[in-house]
Amino acid sequence: MEIKKLYECTVIINGGLEDDAIAATMDEVRNVIAKNGGDIENVLEVGRRTMAYPIGKQTIGSYAHIEFRGEPSGLAAIETAFRYNENILRFLIVHLSTPLLEMRKRVEKYSVVIGSPEDQSEEDQQEESVAAKK
């Protein structure tokens, strides 16, 4: 038995599909990962986005990021299943090594959420406080 490693998979599903079909495709993605020895830790469904360039005449894709632990020997079967799924336009599986995880922690530590008080300039904050007083 191999040691399970941490992976991140980004999937772009055809955005022209109905919401039910996108949800069904996401269920298939989860099932393929689980069937091939993967333990899903985190799923972030970003939703529909306009792509930078068309893929297979599609300009809108539904994006999802999945973090899972799996054996390296199971990746080939996962990739093959994704390639044969017509609803998946693109996918990328990346091994999250220790340096990558450390870099991610540093970025999260210093990142600012858009719309948070840290994101606003002093002028915006002053305008909001003046508006609140009125």
Curated annotation (Swiss-Prot):
GO molecular function, one term: structural constituent of ribosome
Gene3D superfamilies linked to this entry: 3.30.70.60
Annotated keywords: Ribonucleoprotein, Ribosomal protein, RNA-binding, rRNA-binding
Pfam families, per the entry: Ribosomal_S6
SUPFAM superfamilies, per the entry: Ribosomal protein S6
Keyword Ribosomal protein (UniProt): yes
GO biological process terms on file: translation
Gene Ontology, cellular component aspect: ribonucleoprotein complex; ribosome
InterPro entries recorded: Ribosomal_bS6, Ribosomal_bS6_sf, Ribosomal_S6_plastid/chlpt, Transl_elong_EF1B/ribsomal_bS6
Domain of life of the native organism: Bacteria
Keyword Ribosomal protein: yes
Function: Binds together with bS18 to 16S ribosomal RNA.
NCBIfam families found in the cross-reference section: S6
HAMAP family hit by this protein: Ribosomal_bS6
Family label: Belongs to the bacterial ribosomal protein bS6 family.
Protein name (record): Small ribosomal subunit protein bS6
